[in-house]
Structures are given as C-alpha cells and as structure tokens.
Design a protein with these regions (language model features):
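Conserved segment of the helicase C-terminal RecA-like domain
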Residues: 627, 631-663
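Post-DEXD/H (motif II) to motif III coupling segment of the RecA-like Helicase ATP-binding lobe
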Residues: 212-274
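Long, largely alpha-helical accessory region at the distal end of helicase-like NTP-driven motors
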Residues: 305-354, 661-910, 917-924
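Conserved Walker A/P-loop ATP-binding site and its immediately adjacent core
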Residues: 47, 52-87, 107-113, 217, ...
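Conserved helix-turn-beta segment of the N-terminal RecA-like "Helicase ATP-binding" lobe
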Residues: 74-98, 114-128, 253-256
Length: 992
C-alpha cells in the first residue's frame, strides 16, 4: 500500500462513537499543535478517560504508518480491540514485529530489550572497582583482587553484582548522548525493527503510558526519534511523572516538550464520564509473633539511643552536640544563622530536632515554632537525620579514640533499623521491620474482612480486584525472616490460597491472574475449565490443571493441595489472549474477585465492572497510585449508580521508630490524589479518607477499631458517597489551598480566644440597635434628642442606653454586639479579611480578590476551613500560608503588629463606658498581644504599612514594628513560642 493510499483510507475511516467533550478538546489541542508546525503532541488524560481512542484518532488524522508502544500485553490487546471501533475496516492493525500492517502495536520491551552479551564487561568492572575504592577505601589492586576472589569462589553474588554494574554502564552509555553507541546496546530484534522503520517512513510514533520513559526506555525512544527523522510523536499518559531529577526532566522535555492538554480525574467524575469513588483504609497492627520480632529489633535500637544519651559516649556527647547545633546554628563559615536559614539549609535535621525537643517538652529554638508536622513522634528517619549529622560533623573528623569507638558502635547498630553508615553518610537499606509491616499476615486477614463486608453490600454486583506486588516470593526474599513471615508472604499466590480457604471469600470464586499464571481453587477450576472450553473450542482437548506448588514450601505443607493452575497444553495460551478471556469470565460474575499483580492488572488493564480495589502493594509513587486507582473508575453500563471503593490496608507497629513506615507510604500514596471527603469536598491527602488521619503520623492505635468500623460502614453507604461528588454540577477546575482551624477552649488576656465564625455580629447590628432604641424612647420628651445623638456616634449610643435603663434585655444585648463589633476583633473571618486585603493591596494576589473572597466553612470534626473563593492555585497558597503565619506563635518575624483585646462588658454601664473609650482611642483594649506580619507582607516597610491599614480596618488599631526596634526585640523575646490563639491549624488542598 502506497503512502497516498494509506492516507486516503485512514481519512475515510471514522470512530463509531461520538467523542466525549474532553476527548474532543484533546483532538482540538492536537490540531492546534499541528497548525503551529509542531511534531509533538502530549496529552494527560485520567485512567478510563479514553486515551486509546484519542491516540488512534490522532494517528488516523495524521494518515501515516503508525507504531504504538505500550507497557504490557494486556494494554497491547486493548489497542488492537479499540481499532475495531474505527470503520470501515480497510486498514489493518497487528502486533507483528516485522511491521507487516500499517498500524502496529508492540510493547516497549519488544523494541527496547537490550543485548545480553558481555560487550560492556570491561566498563562494568571499572565501575565496580571504583565503587569499592570509594566505599571501602581500597586501592585499585585490592578491589580487583576481591572481585577475582569472588568470581573464583563461584558465588552467585559475583553474577548479581556484575549484572548490576553492567546496567550502570549501560546507563552511562545512554546518558552519553552518542546515538549509535546507544542503539548498539539493543538486541538484534530491536535493531531490526528500527531498520524496518527507517526504510518505510514517514511514521507516527504513539507512546502509551509514556511516564515510563524516564531512564533507559526514554533514552532509547529518543534515539529512535532522532534516527527516524520524519516522525510525529504522540505521548499519552494518565500520570505525568513527578519528582523527576534534572536529568530525567530534560529527557522528558526532549521527547515531549510540554503537555498540550491535562484533564484531572475529579473533572471527569463531575461530568459523569468516570465513576465516583471513595478512598478507604483498614488499619492493622502486626500479629503477636510479628510484634515480638519487631520488639526485639526495637530493643536493639533502644540500646543505641540509650548509649547516645550517655555523657561518656564520644568526646562530645550527643545531647550536647544537638543542643549546640540547634541553638548556635553555625553555618559553613562559622557564623550563626537564623532558624529560617538553618531550616532551609538543613530541612531534615531541623524537623528532627523540633520533634525531639517537642517530645522532651522543651521550647523550640529562637525563631522556630512547633507546627502540626513537628508535634509528631520521632520516626526512624528523624533519628537517622540526627545521628548522621552527629557522625559526619562530630565523630568522623575526630581522631579521639572515644569518637572512633562511638562511630563503630553506631555503624553496627543501624542495620537493624534498615540503614547503613558509610563515610558519606547514612543510606537506606532494606529494613526488616519495614518488610514485616509491608508483608504482615494481618493484611491478608484485613482483605478477607473487607471483601466480606463488600460482598454483603453489593451481592452479585461485587467485582473486586486485589493487587499485590508479585505473584510469588523468591526463595531469598524473606530468607532473613523465616519463622516470622510465611515463605510466600505478600504474594498474590498466598492471598489466593487465603481467600479460597475462607468460606465467605471462597464463595466469590477468586482467580489468580498474572502474566504467567492462571490459578484458582479446585472447585472454581471445574467451572472455569468448562467455560474456557466453550469460549475457545481449540482448547477443548488441551485443558489441564496441576497443583500450585511454590518455592519455600516443603513437601509436608499441604495447604496448597486445593489451589490449582490452569495450563492448557497449547501455544494459544498466551497472556495477550488469556487475559482478555479471564477478564470476561470475571465481568460475567462467574468470579467476583481477581487477584493479580500491579505490573499486569495495575496499569492499562480494562475491566469496566471493577467496583472494589484492595491495594496491598508497596507502590507509593503518584504514577503507580493513579494507575492502580484507575482500574476501578470506569463506568459500568450495568450499574448506572456505580461507586468504586478503593481500599488501602496499612500496618502500624506502635512505639517502634520504623513502625510508621507503612503508614508513611499510605501518606505518600494520597499526597496529591484527590477524593471526596465526608463533607463533600474534593481534597488531596489522607484526610479525605478520614478526618482523624494526619499526613505527619498515624492516629492512636486505640482509635484503629473505630476508624475501621467507620470505613466499613461507609462501604455500605454508597448512595451517600455518590451524592458527595455532586455529579453534573458546575466546577471551577482548579486547586485551592486552604487552612483548617480548630479552636481551643482556654480564653485569656495574654492568650485570647479566636472567635468561631458567626460568633461576631453582622453589619446590621448598629441599624437594628437604633431602631429598637427609638421604639423604647418613643413618646418621651427626650426621644428626639437621644435618637439623634445615637446616629453613627458611639457616644450617642452610650448616652442613649444610660438614659433608658430598663429599656429591655434585647436592647442591652444589641448594644453589646455593636460595641464589640466596633472594637478590636478576634474573629477568624476578620483576621482572614485583613490578610486577604493586605495581599491584594500589595499585589500579592489578584486585584479582584479581597475580604469579600474569604470563605469559612464549618466541618463535622470541629475544624473550620478557610480559603479564598475564586483564587488561583498560587494565590490561594499565598493566602493560606500568610494566614497560618498570623495565627501561629511568634518565631522570627521581620515585623510584628499588635492586636488589642477588649474586656467583655459585664453590665450596661460597662458597655457604655467601653463605647466611650472606643470612641476616644479607636480599636484598642486593655491588653495587647502581637502577631507576625506574614513573610510576603513583611518584605519591606511599604508592604507592612499596607497590611497594617487592612489590619486596622478589620482587626485592631496598631502599627507594624520592625524586629530590630528595641521594643520589638523585647516583645519577641517575651512572647516567642506563646500561642496568641488557642488554635490548631492544618494546611490542605481542595479541588473545586
């Protein structure tokens, strides 16, 4: 077929379904890029958002031969199926590496597999020698001798280490930029594909799930694009990679430039194109024998901590060193630096020091304050930050024998916590405690409980997907934890066995589906094999089953007798065929629970009926999280009111410094993932799961049962979850930073109480008072005089009330309201209004924003959420950070500003006298506290003065005072660390 014939046939082809609004927007963005002469198109669409249709439509419009690269065979099959929705069927699509069809769909592995020969062994050995020199201080001869001895011994570690340094050598070649050297690393099959493409262009190259292209695959794809020359690159992903280093970001930009369109998940849920969902968690603690092991590990670490606190440990004891570091804070030049600078230069050390001081009940250092993050127990990472600083800055430079001995003692103790001390610092190692938490048997038990409740709630409609990291555990994975964990702990195979053994979950007929195995119970196998014979006649005489036997289980282990593998004796039985087949079996409801690995079913796999996801993986990157969650978000045509329940199972070991490792992963999973809260707000972070969950540490284990009960109850209340999404309602489509405020209960003069929203009278109080005063005075000789005096003049109000003593309780109450409103304010909305106007007047936020944009919303857990309506992401962030600074204790402000506190009047006479004083002095009171002028507004005197005008208007009389002023220095020293309000704040992000 000629190039012209292909273009004509593709032009005559069309997608049989109308494109959704955002799909059409993506195609329009492509056309705009093409009009601009660009040969790149990059779209970010959520899982289930129809990326495949968009990619094929773009390829159709380009009218060229097309190669689609995707991450696995399940996704490959979906591309081929989707092309069948383009009619008429005059252009063939296939999966032949010989590129025999105009549209070819291959996996990245088919193209990018590397040559397995030893061409880089010399470079790998050089890297190995250099590494031994750096880490162990060897000479080149010593390093070479150790490697040769390892090879001669026949140790498997030699082959493993050589393979590792080969990979590193290949990476260096890839980063070197020589295209021919890089392409020479490819397997001959990959080089043959490139040669065929070069001889038959021009091409459209579609890169599906292109977030994978950060390292070797990315370098190879970039080399392919450069080799072909005339190629249009289409990048598609649901999850653009985050946390890229500079090299990865540059590579990604080289391939794709910038995104042409990005559509967030909540937008498609609100539009009704994805299913609403709720994020749920089941919290567990280790089983008794696991807890005993963790306690033993904890004891070792406690011994180290006790030694660190002894005054004869090292020439400079650890507590003395720490006190000196955080109080004197010497920079590299020896000069003392501010806490702000110290925190910026040493963020991990600063956080760890604050947490340690808070745990001791000690005040923060000058210029610091305890935030929500700092009021958490120390984690293992915190201790490591403190210990690393002590080792590198105090012990290592010293030749004192006490310091040498202290270094060795720390070096021997750290591996039990999962760290290794080297000359360059402390680096993470595999932590046995973390592994026990990740693979705890309590998680499988939790999965059974979850599926039990979900089955009761959904009945025959249940379609559950349980994801694990691997199908089966290797023999060495858990070698150090024999007797603590099952040899197959964490594997999909063990989970299948557990589900098949429990009477409740066995009724779901769970099936294990991976890239190499289909397994189930013997009872399920009877139905499954018969069904397969009906669907694939050529397998009718080929069906066989055999017992699933896994490494690490001896012959006496009879648990696996009831678990069998389906393995037809036919070449037809390949993942790209049996995965769609088993998916259909699942969607028909013959099995209501699939167990699989995230590598196959956690990305790209499409099953519309999945409505429960149980995530048992350790993957916590935004990419992995969005991909796995995306499996449950597709609309189900048979269940119009579908709500997906996405479950995490988290194991916490209370008391152990590494005991929050699994919870920390849970926090990372939800860090920038949006979901509906119980309030119906779309929020990122773990608080959208449950308001008691903090990003800085787990709740008290005593609350686990109550939280789990609440989660299981929500699984039964899908209608409420559906309603929280407000499907069909308009949305702004922007992220908004907010601050949540919880009010204390201890008011006082030096520590006043921040008024809850609504506690402060509205603007109509003065007019209401005047009308009622006129009613009381009507008919009296003095009426006209007093009402006239009462006008806007507060003294007239006071005179009026004194003259009409006994005129009514409501009159006294209204006067109290008016006087309080015109006096200094301690109301949240007034302080927020002052911050908003100060930022607006200094150009810190958009000019259309201000006091009228402030919103304060009561929350069910006792917090109030404050934010700026209509603000951009950047403006909302600046506002919430500034408001948080004003509400917080003084740390090291550049400017401070007073807020007066008025005594509440106790009688009618007190009210009158207060009114007279306010008329004379303005918004002052008998006591005063000071607040920090927010950093942005304290950048210079002009900004501080403009903030002061807004502060005077809404909060209190007072002028900003520069920190070097003697008065300010004395105030800061006196008030530092004291909370001007008894409040707790939390910073959160909403999607609106």
């Amino acid at each position: 077929m000629t190039e012209g014939d292909l273009a004509a046939r593709l032009a005559a082809t069309s997608f049989r379904y109308p494109l959704r609004r955002y799909q059409q927007a993506a195609v329009d963005a492509f056309e705009q890029a093409r009009r601009e002469g660009r040969a790149r198109f990059y779209a970010v669409l959520p899982p289930g958002g129809g990326k495949t249709a968009v990619g094929l439509e773009v390829a159709r419009r380009l009218g060229r031969r097309t190669l689609v690269l995707c991450p696995n065979t399940a996704v490959q099959a979906q591309w081929l199926r989707q092309w069948q929705d383009f009619t008429p069927h005059t252009v063939a699509a296939g999966a032949d590496p010989d590129l025999t069809t105009p549209i070819t769909v291959l996996t990245y592995q088919a193209l990018c597999v590397l040559n397995g020969d030893d061409t880089l062994d010399e470079e790998a050995l050089d890297l190995w020698i250099a590494t031994l020199q750096a880490e162990k201080g060897y000479s080149a001869e010593q390093a070479r001798a150790e490697i040769q001895a390892l090879e001669a011994s026949g140790s498997p570690h030699y082959r493993a280490d050589l393979a590792r340094f080969r990979r590193r050598a290949r990476t260096l070649v890839a980063r070197g930029g020589d295209r021919s050297d890089l392409l020479a690393l490819l397997h001959p099959n990959g080089r043959a594909i490139i040669a065929r493409m070069a001889a038959s262009g021009p091409w459209t190259l579609v890169l599906d799930e292109c977030h994978h292209l950060l390292e070797m695959w990315g370098y190879l794809v970039r080399a392919l694009v450069e080799e072909l020359g005339d190629v249009f690159v289409v990048g598609l992903t649901a999850t653009p990679p985050s946390d890229m280093d500079a090299r990865e970001a540059a590579l990604y930009r080289d391939i794709f430039a910038r995104a042409n369109i990005e559509v967030p998940i909540p937008a498609l849920v609100r539009e009704g194109d994805l299913a609403p969902y709720q994020e749920l968690v089941y919290l567990t603690t280790p089983l008794p024998h696991e807890a005993d092991y963790i306690a033993a590990q904890h004891a070792r670490f406690q011994e180290l901590l006790l030694r660190l606190m002894e005054l004869d440990f090292g020439s400079v004891p650890f507590p003395v060193w720490l006190r000196t570091r955080v109080e004197e804070r010497r920079g590299r030049d020896g000069a003392q630096v501010s806490w702000e600078r110290f925190e910026r230069d040493e963020p991990r050390l600063a956080q760890a020091a604050l947490r340690l001081l808070h745990s001791w009940g000690a005040p923060p250092p000058d210029g610091a304050r305890f935030s929500e993050r700092d009021r958490q127990p120390l984690t293992a990472d915190d201790w490591v930050a403190l210990i690393e600083d002590y080792c590198l800055r105090c012990l290592r430079p010293s030749a004192d024998p006490r310091d040498v001995a202290a270094w060795e003692e720390i070096r021997r103790a750290l591996p039990s916590l999962g760290y290794i001390l080297t000359r360059r610092g402390v680096r993470a190692h595999v932590s046995p405690v973390d592994r026990v938490l990740t693979l705890s048997a309590s998680k499988a038990a939790a999965a059974v409980s979850i599926l039990d409740v979900e089955s009761a709630a959904l009945g025959d409609q249940l379609r559950a997907l349980v994801l694990c990291d691997y199908e089966r555990a290797g023999s060495d994975l858990l070698a150090r934890l024999r007797g603590v964990l099952d040899p197959q702990a964490g594997s999909a195979a063990l989970l299948l066995h557990i589900l098949a053994s429990d009477p409740t979950t066995a009724a779901l007929h769970p099936v294990l589906l991976t890239g190499r195995t289909v397994a189930c119970s013997r009872a399920t196998a009877v139905d499954l094999t018969q069904w397969i014979k009906e669907q694939v006649p050529e397998l009718r005489d080929q069906m066989t089953t055999e017992q699933l036997f896994l490494p690490g289980n001896d012959e006496s282990d009879t648990r696996w007798e009831d678990v069998v593998v389906i393995r037809p004796a036919s070449t037809w039985w390949q993942p790209r065929r049996y995965v769609p087949l088993l998916t259909r079996y699942f969607e028909e409801g013959r099995s209501r629970c699939l167990v699989g690995t995230r590598s196959l079913l956690g990305e790209g796999w499409d099953a519309r009926r999945v409505n429960v996801l149980v995530d048992l993986t350790a993957a916590a990157t935004p990419t992995a999280v969005h991909q796995m969650r995306g499996r449950s978000l597709r609309l189900d045509p048979d269940l119009p009111d579908k709500v997906a329940d996405n479950w995490d199972v988290v194991c916490v070991a209370p008391g152990h410094p590494k005991g929050t490792a699994d919870y920390d992963r849970f926090v990372r999973k939800h860090h920038h993932y949006f979901a509906a809260t119980v309030e119906g707000e779309i929020e990122s972070g773990v608080s959208h799961v449950h308001p008691e969950l903090s990003p800085y540490g787990p709740p008290d284990p005593a609350h686990f049962a109550a939280i789990n009960t609440a989660m299981l109850r929500r699984a039964e209340e899908r209608a409420a979850a559906h309603a929280r999404w407000n499907i069909g309602e308009p949305y702004e489509g922007r992220e908004t930073h907010t601050v949540r405020v919880r009010f204390g209960r201890t008011p006082g003069l030096s520590r006043s109480r921040l008024l809850t929203p609504g506690a402060r009278p509205g603007a109509g109080a003065v007019g209401r008072f005047r009308r009622r005063l006129g009613q009381v005075l009507a008919g009296s000789a003095a009426a006209g005089i007093i009402v006239a005096a009462a006008g806007p003049d507060l003294a007239g109000l006071a005179a009026g009330i004194v003259a009409t003593a006994g005129g009514g309780a409501w009159l006294v109450r209204d006067l109290h309201e008016v006087v309080r409103q015109l006096g200094p304010s301690d109301a949240l909305e007034d302080i927020a209004a002052a911050v908003a106007e100060g930022l607006r007047d200094t150009g810190g936020i958009a000019p259309e924003l201000g006091a009228e944009s402030v919103r304060v919303v009561a929350q069910a857990d006792g917090y109030y959420r404050c934010y700026l309506a209509g603000a951009s992401e950047a403006d909302s962030r600046r506002f919430t950070e500034a408001l948080d600074e004003v509400l917080a204790p003084l740390a090291s402000p550049r400017y401070i500003i007073p807020r007066y506190i008025a005594d509440p009047p106790g009688s009618m006479l007190d009210t009158a006298l207060l009114a007279l004083r306010l008329r004379r002095t303005g918004r002052r009171g008998r006591a005063v506290v000071y607040h920090a002028v927010p950093s942005y507004l304290a950048a210079n005197r002009q900004r501080a003065d403009r903030f002061a005008r807004a502060w005077n208007r809404y909060v209190s009389t007072g002028e900003p005072i520069y920190w070097k002023d003697p008065q300010a220095s004395a105030i800061i020293a006196t008030q530092r660390g004291a909370d001007p309000f008894d409040v707790t704040t939390q910073m959160r992000v909403l999607w609106r």
